[in-house]
């Protein structure tokens, strides 16, 4: 196992979706970490209208995605539920670093995302947050890393380290930041701004058209296919959000 990610997992402020040693070993098996996306450069967002506007036809796998919004980004997480559902087939960690809230278990279960794949890390400082994010991305044990950088100021060089880590990995890296950073330059491969409910603006994308606005469907959780497959669970979580505050 990668020593850095092992250190992160062993921290007292890290939570795993299961305490089973067997399940953890299964997820951290690096032998098959690159088997699902060996040559892919992107993964579908799960929204045809958004994929059509992105240069690679989805979220870039070799580069960071920066998501800006006016709140703490918790409501933005529904945007990534379809991708998380797809990545769950890899049986690797889906890692949350510095998240202001915890995943709403009934909802992720309704989406078919195993809770034992969820790894939450709670850094105490910005330096720990940056370090944990880079190490998680560079390891081969995470299919996706969500990192909440918030409204703090980050140097271009600090963000570039994360971008380079993502460029050398098949791990999807999503960085959440405040809209206050909109005027700051960024080295990421894709930058989007969520300025209203389900309204996304593509601010920057390498090799593609920018300043593109997309209105997404109301909620991917309630499409006809999922409703038919998970009718009871969907009904029970219609009013829930993807994330709930940490107790």
Predicted regions and their residues:
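Detector for small/aliphatic-rich hydrophobic stretches
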Residues: 1-96, 208, 237-247
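Short acidic, S/G/P-rich loop/turn micro-motifs used as interaction or catalytic elements
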Residues: 71-74, 125-126, 150-155
């Amino acid at each position: 196992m990668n020593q850095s990610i092992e250190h992160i997992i062993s921290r007292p402020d890290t939570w795993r979706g299961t305490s089973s040693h067997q399940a953890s070993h299964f997820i951290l098996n690096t032998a098959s970490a690159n088997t699902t996306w060996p040559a892919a450069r992107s993964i579908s967002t799960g929204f045809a209208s958004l994929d059509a506007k992105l240069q690679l036809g989805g979220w870039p796998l070799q580069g960071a995605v920066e998501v800006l919004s006016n709140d703490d980004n918790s409501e933005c997480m529904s945007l990534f539920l379809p991708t998380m559902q797809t990545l769950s087939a890899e049986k690797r960690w889906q890692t949350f670093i510095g998240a202001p809230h915890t995943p709403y278990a009934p909802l992720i279960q309704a989406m078919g995302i195993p809770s034992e794949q969820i790894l939450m890390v709670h850094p105490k400082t910005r330096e720990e947050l940056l370090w944990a994010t880079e190490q998680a991305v560079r390891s081969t044990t995470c299919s996706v890393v969500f990192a909440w950088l918030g409204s703090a100021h980050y140097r271009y060089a600090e963000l570039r380290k994360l971008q380079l880590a993502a460029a050398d990995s098949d791990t999807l890296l999503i960085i959440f930041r405040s809209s206050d950073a909109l005027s700051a330059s960024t080295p990421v491969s894709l930058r989007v701004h969520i300025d209203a409910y389900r309204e996304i603006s593509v601010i920057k994308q390498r090799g593609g058209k920018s300043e593109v606005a997309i209105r997404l469907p109301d909620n991917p959780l309630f499409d006809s296919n999922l409703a038919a497959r998970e009718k009871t669970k969907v009904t029970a979580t219609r009013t829930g959000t993807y994330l709930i505050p940490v107790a």
